[in-house]
Every structure is written in C-alpha cells, then in structure tokens.
Amino acid sequence: MYRVVTIEEVWDVAKDVKAFRFNENIEFAPGQFIMAWLPGVGEKPFSLAWEDMIVVKRVGPFTTKLFELKEGDRLWIRGPYGHGFIKRGEKVALVGGGIGIPPLYAFAKKNQGKFRQMTLIYGARSKDELSLLDIENYVDDAVITTDDGSAGRKGFPTEVLAERREEFDQVYACGPEPMLKAVLKVMNYKNVQISAERYMKCGIGVCGSCNLGKYLVCRDGPVFEGEKLVGLL
C-alpha cells in the first residue's frame, strides 16, 4: 500500500512553507492528493503540486516533523486519491489563497497554452506568506493581493474575481474555506470547481471523518462542482 520515496530536494517557498521533491514520479490529475506517513508520527493528506512534489505549511506536530526531513531522508506515501479538476472552458481563472496554491500550480503547469486565457488571482495575508512557486510562468495573467498591501494589490482575491467574473467561463479555486465560500457566492455556484478540505484519516472513503454533508471529501472530492455544494458551503 505504501511506497517509500527519498527526498531529493527541500527548499523554502514562503514563511513556514517548504517544498519537498522526491525521487519518484506519480501519475496524477491536478487536484488529487496523497497520504504521507512518518513512522511514529502519523499520516496526513497533501495535494500534489507536481508528479514528484508536495508543498507543506507548518501548522502542527506532523508538519513540524516533516520540516525536519533533509535530502536523502525517506517518506512513506500512498495514493493518489480523489477526483481532480476537470478541464473546461476557454477563458479561466485560478483563484487561490494562502497555502491553496499546489493543485492550482499543477493545473496551470499541465494545461499551459491549452486555454485562450488562463488568469491567476492569488492572495495571502502578507508578502512573506505568498506561496507562488513559479506558477506565473504558466499563466497568461496574474493578479496578486495581500491583506496588508505589502505586495500586489491590497485586498482579497475574491474582490478581484467579483470585478472580473464576466471575463471567465470557468473558475478553479483552492484556499481557506471562507475564501471558497466567497468564490461560490460570487459565481452563484455555477461554472466553478473548488478543492475542499476536511480533517482526513483514511483517505479512501472508509472512516467517514471527512464528511461534507452527504459527501466524503476523500472519495467524492476533494474537487467539487460548485452546484453540488449549494447549502453545504
């Protein structure tokens, strides 16, 4: 069930955010996730940023331990699991907030040049917390926001989306739940796909810990069509 990968590269992405590249490529759809396990520590889900990369924010005991890994150390993984983003539309927006960049990064990289227009709208609390990787290389247009105005436009990505929504025939979103709720509201739950997050244990639809109404995020998501989430988010 698990495969053991070796960490080949670790680098800082933003404040308390690191990227880990390992020695094995995983066939995946942008938006899918893996379960990563450390013996004696536990297991957590992570969206794949690329076929050999995850991006991690330090938020608790597991990620703190993960941050100690160095080149040559081992990590146990299983997956990928779940449903990813569906390519749709001609003029699309990728809307992200905080650490929500990995699945959007994967989508942008895999679909570079396949849309008439692909716009990134991404925000974080401050310049130090921008976790962009090099996603700007794969999109046609990028608007960056920060809550405090320390980089890009002061404000929130959903404000930009509200101003420009008529430009897009499909929106892909990942980020904090309040942002996702705002995206769904701006889009009236139509022509939008969101990557949802819930506490997750098994990753395969058995334990039920990641329920979102009648859905299980690990099995039915983590990517959902907006119309399925009316009354749930």
UniProtKB/Swiss-Prot annotation:
Keywords on record: 2Fe-2S, Electron transport, FAD, Flavoprotein, Iron, Iron-sulfur, Metal-binding, Pyrimidine biosynthesis, Transport
PROSITE patterns, sorted: 2FE2S_FER_1 (PS00197), FAD_FR (PS51384)
UniProt KW Electron transport keyword: yes
A molecular function GO annotation: electron transfer activity
Cofactor(s) essential for the protein: [2Fe-2S] cluster; FAD
CDD domains xref list: DHOD_e_trans_like2 (cd06220)
Residue numbers binding [2Fe-2S] cluster: C202, C207, C210, C218
Domain FAD-binding FR-type: 1-87
Gene3D superfamilies tied to this protein: Dihydroorotate dehydrogenase, electron transfer subunit, Nucleotide-binding domain of ferredoxin-NADP reductase (FNR) module, Translation factors
Organism superkingdom: Archaea
Pfam short name (any one): DHODB_Fe-S_bind
Family membership noted in the UniProt record: Belongs to the PyrK family.
Quaternary structure and interacting proteins, as annotated: Heterotetramer of 2 PyrK and 2 PyrD type B subunits.
Protein name: Probable dihydroorotate dehydrogenase B (NAD(+)), electron transfer subunit
Natural source organism: Thermococcus kodakarensis (strain ATCC BAA-918 / JCM 12380 / KOD1)
Gene: pyrK
